[in-house]
Design a protein with these regions (language model features):
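Membrane-interface junctions at the ends of membrane-embedded or membrane-associated helices
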Residues: 11-21, 230-239, 272-288, 387-394, ...
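Membrane-interface helix-loop-helix junctions at transmembrane boundaries of multi-pass membrane enzymes
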Residues: 382-408
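Juxtamembrane segments of multi-pass membrane glycosylation machinery
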Residues: 145, 149-171
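Membrane-interface alpha helices of multi-pass inner-membrane proteins
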Residues: 241-267, 288-302
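Transmembrane-helix motifs of polytopic, lipid-linked glycan transferases
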Residues: 171-193
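Membrane-lumen/periplasm interface segments of specific transmembrane helices
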Residues: 287-378
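Aromatic- and kink-enriched transmembrane "portal" helix at the membrane-lumen/periplasm boundary
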Residues: 152, 198-220, 246-252
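Hydrophobic/aromatic-rich transmembrane helices and adjacent perimembrane loops
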Residues: 423-446
């Protein structure tokens, strides 16, 4: 018996080592692809890119820095109305990076990330800076601390299309992937789960991200993760590889908008599928799976950023780590404690500020920060009722517990990066999409467990 157990452990160890090596290889390949995309973008003729940026200028000037999405926005209260605010500020910065190259060395430009400026600072006015990028005489500053992968994609697209045409392509891809995800979820899990997926997106005003690729790129990555998972009925090992790809790609394309959803949304769908099909059998399996995927995503996300810093330092022969340290400390910092008593109060204020943006002012009757509390209260009542009637299977209790643990991911993100998420709450609040989704799914599962006659034709059917 001991011999067989030893053999089984030895086999599992070899499989684990093999998977780790596979993940590392895929990560290295991804970094190479990221570099090649950036170099290719820098090689493209600037005349073509510049012409299409110039042709798009009227649209940029008309829209302004912070236009409002018309479906849910009002003008009564900026802080509440920020629910429908479109981030053209960042969009213009990205396009500026796309339109600016020195023309000297594409490899150097790909790491240096030159940016056109009228006052030697990209914070001044992105609209004026972008206009300067279309002219011959302007200041050049650099931002080697980020990948700016979306800017590289923009440069490739601007060599063919104007911004309006790029937006049409982007919206088509975004909504097509959303529809495909809904269909896959409905076919492989349940139509009700598919509806909760859509409702969670709508609560956080998914429509806004359709107007701004820099806000929507994390959604495209998340949808791609869901579709990749369902394409072959992935198991533990395959899904961990997906998480590595998700984490690295997020670090490459996203500029701290809602990165955590590329982990949380695909993992939420995965544990539902694996729980339903008996791949994950108990709470230990669920927790191990959550920890393993979180590590895979986090290491890939952090590793991709670290590789950019190392490559920039080597290729540019410069010490960029001072810049990196300043930018990272700004995101992690407790500088906001000047207006708060301590870091804990700062964290609570950050969480509350993001939660308060969940619903538009027109629909916010009870205070949107209480929406999650209301869902939790109903969930607790249902769980209590299930225990009293002893009608809920242990497997569903384990799954509900795993979803509740997973729902905390954006809260952890807000606490760690409070320096960033407190200031930029008007778009970072969309990280709560995963939390809303997990809690609503928990509510659905517990409700079906409470009413036995519905359980058989519900989640377990």
């Amino acid at each position: 018996m001991d011999f067989y157990k030893y053999q089984e452990m030895n086999i599992m160890r070899k499989i684990t080592e093999s998977n780790i090596i596979k993940n590392i290889k895929v990560f290295i390949i991804l970094i190479c692809i990221f570099c090649l995309i950036k170099i290719f973008a820098c090689v493209l003729p600037s005349d073509l890119v510049n012409k299409n940026v110039q042709d798009s200028w009227i649209e940029f000037e008309r829209a302004g820095l912070y236009p409002m999405e018309p479906l849910v926005s009002s003008t009564e209260n900026w802080e509440r109305d920020s629910y429908g605010q479109i981030d053209f500020f960042t969009e213009l910065i990205m396009i500026n990076f796309a339109n600016t190259v020195t023309g000297n060395n594409p490899i150097s430009d790909s790491m240096r990330n030159p940016y056109s400026s009228v006052q030697n600072a990209y914070e001044y006015n992105p609209l004026e800076n972008l206009k300067a990028s279309t002219m011959e005489n302007h200041d050049i500053i650099e931002a080697p601390q980020y990948w700016w992968g979306l800017a590289a994609l923009y440069r490739i697209l601007f060599s063919i299309f104007t911004y309006d045409q790029i937006l049409i392509i982007y919206k088509f891809i975004l909504y097509l992937m959303l529809f495909c995800c809904f269909k896959k979820i409905a076919d492989n899990l349940d139509g009700k789960i598919g509806m909760i997926f859509i409702i969670s997106l709508l609560i956080c005003n998914f429509f806004v991200v359709a107007y701004s690729p820099n806000l929507g790129i994390t959604f495209i990555i998340s949808f791609a993760g869901i579709l990749a998972f369902f394409s072959k009925g992935m198991d533990h090992r395959d899904f961990n590889l997906i998480m590595v790809i998700m984490g690295a790609t997020t670090a490459y394309l996203d500029w701290m908008s809602t990165p955590i959803i590329t982990y949380q949304i695909p993992v939420c769908i995965a544990i539902l599928y694996m729980g339903k099909n008996g791949i994950l059998k108990n709470i230990k399996d669920y927790i191990f799976f959550l920890v393993k995927t979180a590590l895979g995503w986090s290491l890939a996300y952090g590793g991709a950023l670290l590789m950019k810093w190392i490559l920039s330092a080597i290729i540019l022969n410069e010490n960029i780590f001072t810049i990196v340290r300043n930018r990272v400390s700004a995101g992690l910092s407790n500088d906001g404690t000047a207006q708060f008593k301590n870091g804990l109060e700062y964290s609570i204020a950050t969480i509350k500020r993001n939660m308060s943006n969940l619903l538009p002012d027109k629909l916010d009757i009870i205070g949107s920060e209480y929406l999650i509390i209301l869902i939790l209260l109903v969930l607790c009542i249902f769980i209590l009722g299930s225990f009293c009637r002893r009608s809920m299977k242990i497997e569903l209790i384990d799954l509900t517990g795993a979803l509740c643990v997973l729902s905390l991911a954006p809260i952890v993100w807000y606490i760690v990066f409070k320096g960033h998420t407190y200031i930029h709450f008007w778009f970072t609040y969309r990280s709560l999409i995963g939390m809303i989704m997990c809690l609503l799914l928990s509510l659905l599962i517990v409700a079906e467990g409470l009413f036995k006659e519905r359980t058989q034709r519900g989640f377990n059917s």
